Amino acid sequence: MGESLNGLKRTIMCGEIRENHIGNRVVVMGWVQRKRNLGGLVFVDLRDREGILQVVFGEEINKDAFMKADLVKSEYCISVSGTLVKRESPNPNMPTGMVELKGEEIKILSESETPPIYIKENLDAAENIRLRYRYLDLRRPDMQKIFKIRHKTTKIIRDFMDEENFLEMETPILTKSTPEGARDYLVPSRNYNGKFYALPQSPQLFKQLLMVSGYDKYFQIAKCFRDEDLRANRQPEFTQVDMEMSFVEEDDVIELNERLIQKVFKEMAGVEVKLPIERMTWKTAMEKYGSDKPDLRFGMEINDISEAVSTSDFKVFKSAIEEGGSVRAIKAPNSADMPRKKIDKLGEFVKTYKAKGLAWIALKEDGIKSPIAKFLKEEELKAIIDKVQGKTGDLILIVADKNSVVFQSLGALRLEIAKELEILKDNKEFRFVWITEFPLLSYNEEEERFQAEHHPFTMPMDEDIEYLESDPGRVRAKAYDIVLNGEELGGGSVRIHDTALQERMFKVLGFTKESAWERFSFLLEAFKFGPPPHAGLAYGLDRLIMFLAGTENIKDVIAFPKNQNAFCPLTEAPNVVDENQIEELGIKVESKEEE
């Protein structure tokens, strides 16, 4: 049985001790990192949240403490009282390496079994083991460093928002299901039989209502939930830095958030973000990078070579252009000698993005090598090379298809080649860009209807409103995403604040007036009472912390994450519940038949 503290108080954290503390009598508490018995001396590395301190116990210092210290094992939780002295053999690799503690008294607060994972930095352990014993995984110094970064970052954000006169307000977790996009997590109501709450995918509607309520500037570090198929770096529950402002336009939101980004990255990463941050329209991003979240740390831009081959007899190019598509290319530098097998692999890669194939032209020392050269005139080949600014040693990769396929496949290929050529290896740059003027709507061919690109409350650009019903695909949105190194960090928009325009939007999305009012009556009703123009933005806090902590795994920045199957190996949630609980809810559970 562990000893109790009996009024003993810790006086300093292990990792905070430095040379200027030598001579002080201290009380430290923590976990045994390791123990070494060197005959007449026992050395214990004691670890707490702030770091590791070497403690030495000896018969000459205190015999009882020495004998007791010899009993401790890895991960025992102990307290030690004693005097700090200069270390005889300093360790310059440790912040506390010039000092050690002479242990005069020790208490074993609790014992530990042999841990199933090592408590050390850079642990190479299976993810399911780490998640199963997450409380041990979180003891590791590199994990604790991440959560200090998370804490400090949210504090900087809160302080900044407070200085900018924002109010931190909480919005409901149990709310109404308004499905449009990802699936809601549903919570059955015991009091209202057959009815359900939904967990919020974002605080979107409530923050708009707060603007109608006259709160002017709102923010929240908000928990959000989406019941969607998990891709890499997605979690069913995640955290947003959410904000909304009244009487503002797009530029106001962008300007404020640029200053916030600048502050966070200066204080947390020591990086000076130059303002204003570059802006790029969605159309330009797609045409140049094949993505609405372009990674601008490297070039390899997409080039439209349709004009260069517009009179070509090569059937693949000709039919793509005739059918309203295009022929576009990227240039892989110094890759002309890429093995044919690798090029064929890249051809298979673009097919996963619905491209029919990949044409290529290698600019070798001894001339041009290409399976399509025989189909192209000499001047067409020259025009292609000129358009992509090709030089000897380069490899030109070409896709011909409808524009959406060309953009998607070449955008993905651009990133794949950058990975293959290790273009971004050891690149520590933070490259921001705002993407603006998104399409307001996109056509869902399966459902045969238009759907909102962001959400149905986004304001169309003023000059495009007239096309809302007649040509919905043409309408651009007052929407903006902040992108960092090819990842969407956050997104926002100016909101519709007019009932009539909001009803028009719902109609284009396929809602009847009745169904729109049934789902969103509380918002539409509120818009009858003088709503202000308003706009906002939300960041993915987890993704922001990933950048600041230098990890590519979202599970590293969430204390208790789910695995790739939305399952918690630690608590085994989701799990079965008592039959009584289910009966109270008026729910009948049927087994899903295996497909």
From Swiss-Prot:
Record: residues binding L-aspartate: E180, R226, H454, R495
Alphabetical UniProt keywords: Aminoacyl-tRNA synthetase, ATP-binding, Cytoplasm, Ligase, Nucleotide-binding, Protein biosynthesis
InterPro entries: Aa-tRNA-synt_II, aa-tRNA-synth_II, aa-tRNA-synth_II/BPL/LPL, Asp-tRNA-ligase_1, Asp-tRNA-ligase_1_N, Asp/Asn-tRNA-synth_IIb, AspRS_core, GAD-like_sf
MF terms in GO: aspartate-tRNA ligase activity; ATP binding; catalytic activity, acting on a protein; nucleic acid binding; transferase activity
Enzyme class label: ligase
PROSITE patterns: AA_TRNA_LIGASE_II
Protein name: Aspartate--tRNA ligase
Organism whose genome encodes this protein: Clostridium acetobutylicum (strain ATCC 824 / DSM 792 / JCM 1419 / IAM 19013 / LMG 5710 / NBRC 13948 / NRRL B-527 / VKM B-1787 / 2291 / W)
Lineage: Bacteria, Bacillati, Bacillota, Clostridia, Eubacteriales
